[in-house]
A protein has these predicted regions:
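Surface-exposed repetitive/solenoidal architectures
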Residues: 1-343
Length: 343
């Protein structure tokens, strides 16, 4: 994506309004938008363009209809245009987004394609409505359809819905992840997808899912689902994740509270309280380790060890294996009772 001619000094640039965000989605895709320019929204930080969200933003349905999905992926490899910069949400929230694909495409979300160098950090999305009127998309999600980059500190909160008769593969944070999703969460997503499989964090994972959680999502009206991830592909990782109180399962309990299907991957340090289903529904050439069930009332696992201690102790013991990553700490919350915070 074209991010040339951007100021390199930090002069208060950023995205403040819904109109700003709409303009940003056009400009970052290389399209003109009135007399606006990308230099209004970003600065160069360590030779990388960073765009800032300066406020919480509430969207109207009319404003949502004018948004462009950021990035485009073509399976042929031609005309790919992924997000390669950094969007720093600064812990602000986008409210009342309505996401709807407008054509057949490989992947669709707020960011359809985040490429290898791309970063989305510290962004909250609350009360989002995702619907598909009949278009064919291979991967669909709320935040990023196809992630090859880094998603960190991003959270889906509030009351959220995901609907569409044509949807086949759906995720909360990502549709397919080939990069790293770390320190992220998905809460209260009602997946009304009778012909689809779904997951709270990432539908398909070829990369890393680290230090994430899913809370109170409803998968009742799906074919089969996984709380954190639907399918873990060969050599992928899911580590130090937990799920809290799944609202409903697909028929015949075709549900893994952490993962639905795993194939020659690493699953380590996972906790769940849905005791009437499996943590990992189906394993192939995979031996999950340090998988715990816990009591949702006391938030303790085996031998009365607090869940929060298991999660934070894993970081203390293993963060040095990921020197380029920043792990947010687990702290006590309300609902869900354990959340993430950068300290």
């Amino acid at each position: 994506m074209n991010s040339s001619n951007i100021k390199s000094s930090n002069d208060g640039c950023g995205i403040s309004t819904a109109e700003d965000f709409i303009a940003f989605t056009y400009l970052i895709n290389g399209e003109a938008y009135a007399d606006r320019c990308l230099e209004e929204f970003g600065t160069s930080v360590n030779e990388k363009m960073t765009y800032y969200l300066l406020n919480d933003i509430h969207f109207t349905p009319e404003e949502c209809a004018r948004l462009q999905s950021i990035g485009h992926y073509n399976q042929s490899g031609f005309e790919n245009s992924g997000f390669i910069d950094c969007l720093d949400g600064q812990n602000h929230t986008l409210y009342e987004l309505k996401l709807e694909p407008k054509s057949n495409m490989d992947s669709y979300a707020l960011f359809s394609f985040v490429d290898t160098a791309g970063i989305i950090k510290d962004l909250n999305i609350e009360n989002v409505s995702y619907s598909n009127a009949g278009y064919t998309c291979k991967y669909e999600a709320i935040l990023t359809g196809r992630n090859n980059g880094t998603i960190t500190g991003c959270h889906i909160k509030g009351n959220n819905s995901f609907t569409g008769e044509s949807v086949k593969q759906a995720g909360g944070i990502a549709g397919i992840n080939k990069g790293c999703v770390i320190n992220c969460s998905a809460e209260n997503i009602d997946f009304q997808l009778p012909k689809a499989q779904a997951s709270g964090i990432s539908f398909s994972n070829f990369g890393q899912l680290l230090n994430c959680y899913m809370a109170s999502c409803d998968f009742t009206n799906t074919l089969s689902s996984g709380g954190i991830c639907y399918t873990m592909e060969p050599r992928s990782e899911m580590k130090n994740c937990y799920t809290y109180k799944t609202i409903g399962y697909p028929s015949k309990k075709k549900y893994g509270s952490l993962v639905y299907k795993s194939n020659n991957c690493t699953i380590e340090s996972g906790l769940y309280c849905d005791v009437d289903v499996r943590g990992v529904y189906d394993t192939y050439q995979t031996t999950p380790k340090q998988i715990y069930t816990y009591d949702e009332n006391t938030m303790t696992a085996e031998n009365d060890i607090p869940v929060i201690d298991i999660l934070n102790n894993w970081i203390s013991d293993n963060a040095q294996l990921y020197p380029e990553k920043i792990f947010y700490q687990w702290i006590k919350g309300d609902i869900p009772p354990i959340i993430l915070e950068l300290r």
